[in-house]
């Protein structure tokens, strides 16, 4: 009847209004947390880099940042097929501790342009040369164009692909430093084969990054790691239960203890008398003041969850606040970003729920009325009859059990079919192990 249709539409209107209010309130809540209740300003920036590429980033600027009160800066990069927003939680925590953050959208991600290289290995070429835009963004942000940035305290970090970009960026300036020192030692330089103070200062001025923390990217040659180009404080963060653990000698994600990669990474900056044969997780080695600091973090986290796992976020906070000597009353354990996660989840669920009343109201519009069924179709028997309902739920549970059992059965099969990919080696199939598992 017409009255029933009218009542249903009114009910949908009320439901939709309630859901829209929930979305609005949750979004405002997330925004307040992200800006530390108005104490942090966020803004989007866009720059043009070499080869006429566009690179975008979101800046998180603490309220107290000014030309008279310069603040440290951390530049972040997401992983492959991820969004710059994934690092917003880390940015929220660092910025409320007085550190400006630039959440970069790497080339071919978000609204940034594509990398200019062509061919099958274009992604890897760019990661190992341009850092997917991180080098260009670092050059821009440390050029002095932003008067509130302390260019003597600039850090870089990123996850997975972003971790490789972090290695690339910090080592890019390290190689420039090495070249300057080599030039200063040439016989035709100002001081001859001896390095003058001015030559040393000129070389040190090329080190635009002063602290680096690659995440989910162990210090191996495959990730572009070159210890000879590291002249600043560097850490490495790997989840203790990462899926990419087969990339290291332990064949697990463990790079502390007696892991070769961890020992070599720590010893790379230590003198012969200081070298170690066992690495403690979360322990500082070397010296912050002379830029020989090294540390390895192994929080309980899988690979992709590192930027949102509390233990990992605390480690990231601890590293940069320590390297930059940030005096803040906010401890690394005081985290507010989970509230933003909650608000985001509420807004998302409300948005999904709003699709039902919205679609019903749209179908009531004259232009879409022909798409609406003349009468409501009968319910599925399984939802009306108890006996059929029992069969239905038994089928659902049985189907789930079959999925679990077959997953365990296909894992060994997957390792046999894709032996190279299972240990992180690129193949003619897919170069990421989970993709091959889907095939099997």
Give the residues covered by each predicted segment:
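Generic preference for well-ordered secondary structure
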Residues: 29-31, 78, 196, 300, ...
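Short, small-residue-biased leader/transition segments that mark boundaries at the very start
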Residues: 1-6
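Membrane-embedded alpha-helical segments in integral membrane proteins
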Residues: 26, 30, 324-333, 406-412
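Core alpha-helical transmembrane segments of integral membrane proteins
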Residues: 334-440
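Context-gated lysine
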Residues: 7, 36-41, 70, 118, ...
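An N-terminal hydrophobic leader/cap segment in hydrolases
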Residues: 8-48, 56
């Amino acid at each position: 009847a017409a009255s029933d249709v009218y009542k249903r539409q009114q009910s949908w209107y009320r439901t939709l209004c309630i859901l829209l209010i929930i979305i609005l309130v949750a979004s405002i809540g997330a925004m307040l947390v992200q800006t530390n209740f108005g104490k942090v300003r966020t803004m989007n920036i866009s720059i043009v880099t070499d080869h006429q590429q566009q690179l975008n980033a979101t800046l998180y600027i603490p309220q107290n940042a000014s030309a008279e009160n310069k603040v440290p800066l951390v530049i972040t990069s997401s992983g492959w097929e991820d969004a710059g927003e994934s690092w917003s939680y880390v940015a929220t925590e660092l910025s409320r501790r007085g550190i400006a953050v630039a959440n970069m959208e790497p080339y071919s991600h978000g609204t940034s342009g594509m990398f200019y290289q062509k061919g099958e290995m274009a992604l890897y070429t760019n990661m190992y040369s341009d850092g997917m835009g991180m080098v260009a963004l670092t050059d821009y942000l440390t050029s002095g164009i932003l008067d509130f940035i302390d260019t003597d305290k600039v850090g870089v970090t990123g996850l997975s692909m972003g971790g490789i970009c972090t290695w690339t960026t910090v080592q890019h300036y390290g190689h420039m430093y090495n070249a300057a020192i080599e030039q200063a030692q040439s016989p035709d330089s100002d001081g001859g084969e001896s390095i003058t103070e001015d030559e040393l200062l000129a070389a040190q001025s090329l080190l635009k990054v002063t602290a680096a923390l690659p995440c989910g990217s162990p210090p191996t040659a495959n990730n572009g790691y070159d210890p000879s180009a590291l002249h600043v404080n560097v850490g490495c963060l790997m989840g203790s239960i990462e899926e990419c653990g087969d990339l290291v000698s332990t064949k697990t994600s463990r790079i502390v203890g007696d892991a070769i990669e961890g020992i070599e990474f720590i010893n790379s900056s230590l003198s012969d008398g200081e070298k170690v044969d066992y690495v403690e997780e979360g322990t500082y080695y070397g010296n912050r003041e002379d830029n020989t600091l090294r540390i390895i973090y192994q929080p309980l986290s899988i690979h992709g969850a590192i930027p949102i796992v509390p233990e990992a976020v605390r480690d990231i906070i601890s590293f940069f606040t320590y390297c930059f000597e940030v005096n803040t009353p906010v401890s690394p354990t005081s985290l507010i970003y989970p509230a933003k996660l909650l608000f985001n989840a509420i807004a998302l669920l409300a948005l999904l729920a709003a699709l039902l009343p919205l679609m019903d109201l749209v179908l009531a519009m004259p232009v879409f009325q022909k798409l609406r069924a003349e009468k409501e179709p009968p319910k599925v028997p399984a939802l009306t009859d108890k006996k059929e309902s029992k069969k239905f739920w038994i089928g659902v549970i049985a189907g789930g059990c079959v999925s679990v059992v077959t997953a365990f059965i296909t894992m060994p099969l997957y390792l046999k079919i894709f032996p190279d990919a299972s240990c992180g080696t690129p193949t003619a199939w897919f170069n990421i192990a989970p993709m091959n598992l889907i095939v099997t």
